[in-house]
Amino acid sequence: MAALLFAFYLFDMTYVKVKVYHKTGYGFKGKFKRLPRALRNFKPERDVYFYLFTEHNTHQGHRIYPEKPSSLFISHFDFNKDVKILIHGWKNTGNSTFGRTVKDAYISQMGVNVIVVDWHKLSILAYHRSCRHMDMVAVRVAILYDFLRQYVARRAIHIIGHSLGAHVAGIAGEVVQRGKIYRITGLDPAGPMISKIRTHGRLDKEDAEFVDVIHTSGFMLGFYSPLGHADFYPNKGTPIQPGCGVDVVGRCSHRRSYHLFQESIFNSSEFMALQCQNWKHFVKNKCFPTWHRMGEHIQYGIEGKFFLRTARKSPFDVGYTTDLKSRVHNLTTISNKTV
């Protein structure tokens, strides 16, 4: 039986040259990559899409081609504004809820350039295949980053990835050639098949000058261990997140990360989290008296693990007071009513 399965595995695999790796100088060892037959026609330079959205085109994205600078010049790209790059996760597309909600929040609140990465031709496959070959998407993101760096400052570019998209961002950070990425935000980075990987091939704090992470479905769909400089754990960072009902596999909790992040864009004073060693200490008020914002308006350069509670539904911020003792008391009181 084992021999039969191995034979099927060999039949299902074929060597496909991924030209983008050796042609551009990006990527990893070897110029051949073993790909399943389902991906033999997948070409990253053709099948990974970059759509630009701005205040002038909020609903219809303009496709950007890193190899064609004119595609940027004829768009509504504002060279004086920041750039937010959004990378979706498994079984999603560029038009899924994550991309739409976060993109709309950025444009309406901050008026920035938003580039949505759409890699659905790979992300719709079985999870193990999407996971094994997401490095091809990461190389394309790295090429996009280096292309943009010719026209905007390094500090102007911020990459946000959800689920597998967070690891795509991290791998891109390993191979960029025009300076280290300034900031990467991981929204509940995927855990399955990745939690055993040490550093390379997943998101970690070496992939950008500053990496912040929001964990909401650790030990299930998400990665629980710290991955960045600053790791935030709303409601312990595990399922079931408040308001998610049964949530057997953690899907609702997995999505909660980008809903919290989307809300953080609108208010720079929300989602204050307490630096703490672990959740048990947080609940018992045995933490450092150090509070920091979670989300878009995070204080750059902070390090550590941070814990907070959120409400069952939007608005998720619990709105506690500024006094430290009152904060902890209010957090506990409000959470007991909502969880």
For the regions a protein language model found, what residue spans apply to each?
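Glycine-rich nucleophile elbow surrounding the catalytic serine of serine-hydrolase chemistry
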Residues: I160-A172
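Flexible, membrane-associating and regulatory peripheral segments of lipid-active enzymes
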Residues: M1-V116, S123-H133, A142-R154, Q177-G179, ...
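Active-site nucleophile loop of the alpha/beta-hydrolase fold
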Residues: R183-M193, V213-G218, G237
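Catalytic His-Asp charge-relay segment
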Residues: F210-I214, D231
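The conserved beta1-alpha1 loop
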Residues: I87-G89, H162, D188
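Alpha/beta-hydrolase active-site loop signature
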Residues: K121-S123, G191
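Alpha/beta-hydrolase fold nucleophile elbow
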Residues: Y151-S163
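Tubulin/FtsZ superfamily GTPase core signature
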Residues: I171-G173, I181-I184, G222
